[in-house]
A protein has these predicted regions:
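Internal, hydrophobic beta-strand segments that form the core of beta-sheet-rich folds
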Residues: 47-53, 101-154
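Short aromatic-acidic-glycine turn motif
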Residues: 51-62
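Short beta-strand elements
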Residues: 65-74, 139-180
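Short, basic amphipathic alpha-helical segments that act as recognition/interaction helices
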Residues: 201-212
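Extended, solvent-exposed segments with strong compositional bias
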Residues: 66-122
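Low-complexity, acidic Ser/Thr/Pro/Gly-rich terminal tails and inter-domain linkers that flank the onset
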Residues: 1-28
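Surface-exposed, Lys/Arg-rich phosphate-binding patches that contact polyanionic backbones
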Residues: 185-202
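Contiguous beta-strand segments within globular domains
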Residues: 20-33, 42-50, 106-110
Length: 212
C-alpha cells in the first residue's frame, strides 16, 4: 500500500478588510486552504506574490484618460495593459486537517511613483482584479506520524476582485486625501527656496502656485 502524501493544496481568497492602525497601512486578506489527503498539516511556510491583472476589467473613457500615463495612449486600452506587481508577502499557515483559514497582510502605499498605487488611485469604483501566486513548504504528519516535507507547487494561485472602495477608504483614512511623489534633493531645495521667496505656507502651496 502506498503512503498517503499531500498533493497540491487549493487556495481561495474569501474576503478582505483594512487595517489602518498598523505602522504601515495593511489590507488583510482572508484565505482558505484545502487539502484532500486527510493528513494533519502542521504548518505551511507560505509566500504569495500579489499582482494586479489590469486586463481583466473594463474602463470608461474618463478612467482610460487617467491611466494614459501608465499604459500609454488611451485608445489602445486594454491592449496595452498588463499585470502590475503589488507586493510579496510571507506567512506561517496554522495547523489544519482538511481545510483551514489564515490571513495575508499586504502592505499598501499611496506613493504615486509606484505603478500599482497609481493604477488603484485612478479607478473611481468597481473592483481591481488580483492574482495571488503561491509557493512555499508544507510540513505535515505522514502515515506513521513522522514529519514529512513537500513543496507548494508553483501552479498554485487564487484570484480575487478587490473592491476599489476598500483601497480608497484605507488611503483616505490614513493619509487624509494626500498622495506622495518622490522628488530629487535638488528639486526639493528649489521648492524650499521658492516657498521662502513667495512667502507661501507649505510645499504643497508652492507646487500649486508654480502650476498655475
Amino acid at each position: 500500500m502506498s503512503e498517503l502524501a499531500v498533493a497540491a493544496p487549493e487556495f481561495a481568497v474569501v474576503g478582505v478588510e483594512p487595517e489602518p492602525t498598523a505602522a504601515t497601512p495593511l489590507l488583510l486578506f482572508t484565505v482558505q486552504v484545502t487539502d484532500e489527503s486527510g493528513l494533519e498539516i502542521y504548518t505551511i511556510a507560505l509566500t504569495a506574490q500579489v499582482q494586479l491583472d489590469a486586463d481583466r476589467r473594463a474602463y470608461d473613457p474618463a478612467t482610460r484618460g487617467r491611466l494614459q500615463d501608465l499604459f500609454g495612449e488611451a485608445a489602445r486600452l486594454p491592449a496595452t495593459v498588463g499585470p502590475l506587481q503589488i507586493g510579496r508577502v510571507a506567512t506561517m499557515v496554522p495547523s489544519f486537517t482538511g481545510a483551514g483559514r489564515f490571513t495575508l497582510a499586504l502592505p499598501i502605499s499611496a506613493d504615486l511613483e509606484l505603478a500599482a498605487a497609481r493604477y488603484l488611485a485612478s479607478l473611481p469604483d468597481g473592483t481591481a482584479p488580483l492574482t495571488f501566486n503561491f509557493n512555499g513548504t508544507i510540513f505535515y504528519a505522514g502515515a506513521d506520524e513522522r514529519l514529512q516535507v513537500t513543496l507548494v507547487p508553483w501552479s498554485c494561485f487564487a484570484r480575487y476582485r478587490l473592491p476599489v472602495s476598500v483601497w480608497h477608504g484605507l488611503v483616505e483614512q490614513r493619509h487624509a486625501g494626500c498622495g506622495f511623489v518622490r522628488l530629487q534633493s535638488e528639486t526639493l531645495e528649489l521648492l524650499r527656496r521658492r516657498r521662502v521667496e513667495r512667502g507661501l505656507a507649505s510645499l504643497d502651496a508652492t507646487i500649486a502656485e508654480a502650476l498655475r
